[in-house]
Amino acid sequence: MPLHNVVVTGIGPVGAFGLGADALSSALQTDQPLAQPATKNQGLGLATDLACEIPADSFKIRDVVPKSHRKAIKVMCPDIESALAATDSAIRHANLRTTTTHPEETPIPDPLRLGCQLGAGLIAADVEELGGAMTVAAPEGVVDVQLWGREGMERLTPLWMLKYLPNMPACHVTIVHGAQGPSNTMTCGETGSMLAVTEAARVIERGDADACLAGGTEDRIHPVQRMRQHLSERLGKGVPFKDTGAVPGEGGAVLIVESLEHATARSATILARVTGIAGGQSPHCTRDGGVPKDDPSFASVMERAIEDAGVSAQDIDEVITSASGVNSDHAEQHAIASILGWSAQDPRITTPAKIFGNCGAGLGALVASTAVLRISQGQAQRVLAFVTGQGGQHAALVLEASA
């Protein structure tokens, strides 16, 4: 059933390109990979040392957190910090008002009608923070679970886990901006932040919120995260449709998903309409993220999003896909070819992950933000945005220009 009441009025992307819609737009126009030798956690002996890091001058966490909440910075991991930066940017881009961005003014929308849906990953603990505990628990180089529970845990600060719970990005975002509407956290790998946008669309469509902060972020350049990718043979140079491995990135995006009535009432600029959504799961995914080229779940999710939008495949002007140089890229391309008849070299297929890397839970929101920019800048009228996760999850959106 097509969505009739859901629009996007702001985006807050953050990544190797910097922070904000203009920064992402410039990077997309340049269309050059931003991967560089990692400046953090070097010398890990991995398949590649390339990474898409957020530039240090992109934002300062103290600038996006009110003074009353700054004590909490000590329990913020990079995933939380980037979520707060992305949210602040999105709110300002949409010209909304919250208790933090406009403390002296009445919030728009009503805090009780402002929801928050964010995707989050398996947040890795700080290596130095865990180092002391691990040393005590593994005196002979092998972890002794008895020592870990009895003595190792005593080396951790009491609040250490508050940095790493997947729902903490949404917790901090809702507290900082006074969002008291429906909230949810999606832990579905790379698809999490796009699924968060689909969740926000449904929340708004059923009338439970006027606007939602939807998206997600993740730090995939953390040494533990990079080691996970290395051990599962997923690291590489990030060449779309080449299966050479992905470049890890950090960042993501938050989108302002709003009801058409609310956006119109406040004379907001409508960047795009959300008209179709879908999600699914591959039953074939292997340890390295591999799936058969003809895995039907890819095409199924794309087709259902198009059907949900009430249009046909011939009405799609462009496809924005998560292809980042991993095995599942071939199945993405096979699905696009079977539905639309487009080859991997077709200029109507955009693969922006080469710009910002694989940001884990932030990837889907960056793909969605790219689609929003294409539409708002008049480069396409109707876009299919698709992302697949390393666990075989899929999500798709159909976004259209405002009538």
What are these regions (language model features)?
Residues M1-I73, A94, E261-T275, S369-Q377, ...:
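ACP-dependent fatty acid/polyketide chain-elongation machinery
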Residues N5-T9, P33-P37, L235-V311, D317-E318, ...:
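Condensing-enzyme catalytic core mediating Claisen C-C bond formation in acyl metabolism
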Residues A47-A56, D219-P240, V254, G279-S300, ...:
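Active-site-adjacent elements of ketosynthase-type condensing enzymes
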Residues V8, Q29-H177, R220, A313-L340:
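Conserved beta-ketoacyl condensing-enzyme motif
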Residues I11-G12, P66-M76, H102-E105, G149-W160, ...:
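Cysteine-centered functional microenvironments
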Residues A138-L156, T198, R202-E205, E218-A265, ...:
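Glycine-/small-residue-rich "gating" segment that lines the acyl/pantetheine channel
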Residues A83-N95, P166-P169, T174-A179, S183-G215, ...:
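Active-site-proximal alpha-helical scaffold in enzymes
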Residues G115-G119, T187, C212-E218, V257, ...:
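Short beta-strand segments
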